[in-house]
Amino acid sequence: MQKLRTINLTKIMLLLLAVVGCTGQSLFVSYNMTICYVATLLGVIILIIRKKIEKIEGIHIWFLLVTIYIGGSILTSKFSIQTTAYFRLFLCIELVFLIGLKEEYKLYFINLCKGLASIVAISIILEVIIPDLFTEYFWFIATPKHDMGVLATLSKNIARGYYSGFACEKSAAAYIMNIGLACIGAEYFTNEKMKKINYIWAMLYLVGILLTGKRMLLAIPIVIYIIALLSLKKKNKITTILGSIILGIAIFYIASNAIPQLGVTFQRFSMYEDDTLRGRDNLWLYALALFKTYPFLGVGYGAYNKMASMWGLTTGDGIAWSTNAHNIYYQLLAETGIIGTCLFVFLFVIGIVTTIKKIKMFNRNDYKPILLFSLFVQMITLLYGLTGNPIYTVNELIMYGISLTFIAKCTLEKK
């Protein structure tokens, strides 16, 4: 009975975290922190029932050091409320480490992510067919309080050819499509083949990214795919790459004739003025200025927006800045100083290195997709971190943290 209760609570906890990680800026966004707190409470209950915690070792040590550092920095943070909120999220992930997820739970979480990504992909396609799907018919998914500003932003994006579907924000939607591709890719590179239905899902995820207009989040899965082919596939690497390019071009040509909006992303690649780097250099300058002023401890994790706004950073309408530095590395320097940034960089590097080592060390196919999923999510996070805010958005921070827990507790048969 005790074991059954633990199993059910663990699955509920993972379901809640998957909902946070893979639903974007939809109606759940207002409750993301609350959902994470409930998941944290469930984690505590699970540990109490089990009366034991997992051994702290490997990547867990580095994550714990980062968590302790963020917790300690609350005392020196210029805006402790923001730092405290993020600290609670890190504690939530820390509890998942302490619980020590078994293989079945990790596969369960991956399947949840794939299911949610599929829902978002289908909703993006539906939004192309019915442009006012989430601004008129299902507006409560985008904004339960019927915020006209949110609906106006969605309408403006749709008018420009940028779709986000159920995720209700183009960057969030493109990120979720990347997670869907990570699920599919983990299966493919485990067996060098996959179910036919998953080829269809892979195409839908790619189409979903194209319809969001987010170039960086389109480039990332392509880069990861090529790297994975060169390093993981055992034979016909070049042939597979060339075949994938030809097939991709053919599919895009056919699909773009049926859905003209697919061309928006590629049109934006050729535009000089765009939102990949436009204005970001200014955000980075503020981050570097904060780092120079507070070089050792920084201004506090999550405090960039408040501090930069105090120093004069605003939107074009003169509203205080609220969407971070669009580069996690510059922002870490500003918020955690040289000490905290070093801890994070060690966490990033050791996470990738440890995952690759375990992929090579263990040969059980039923565990390999878990490690590959973890590797792909980590790579998405670190690459997207060059122009985005993946460790500052609740959804994406949770996904990155969970991916790290996946490389802990590996008790597999060695080669």
Please place each PLM-identified region on the residue numbering:
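N-terminal signal-anchor transmembrane segment
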Residues: 1-50, 66-76, 381-383, 402
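Hydrophobic, aromatic-rich transmembrane alpha-helices
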Residues: 2, 15, 37-52, 178-190, ...
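Transmembrane alpha-helices of multi-pass inner-membrane enzymes
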Residues: 41-44, 372-415
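Hydrophobic transmembrane alpha-helices and their immediate junctions
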Residues: 58-61, 118, 197, 222-230, ...
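Aromatic-anchored transmembrane helix interface
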Residues: 63-68, 79-101, 111-117, 124
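Alpha-helical transmembrane segments of multi-pass inner-membrane proteins
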Residues: 110-144, 149-159, 165-231, 379
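A membrane-periplasm/extracellular boundary helix in multi-pass inner-membrane enzymes
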Residues: 122-132, 232-271, 288-293, 301
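Long extracytoplasmic/lumenal interhelical loops at the membrane interface
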Residues: 270-289, 293-336
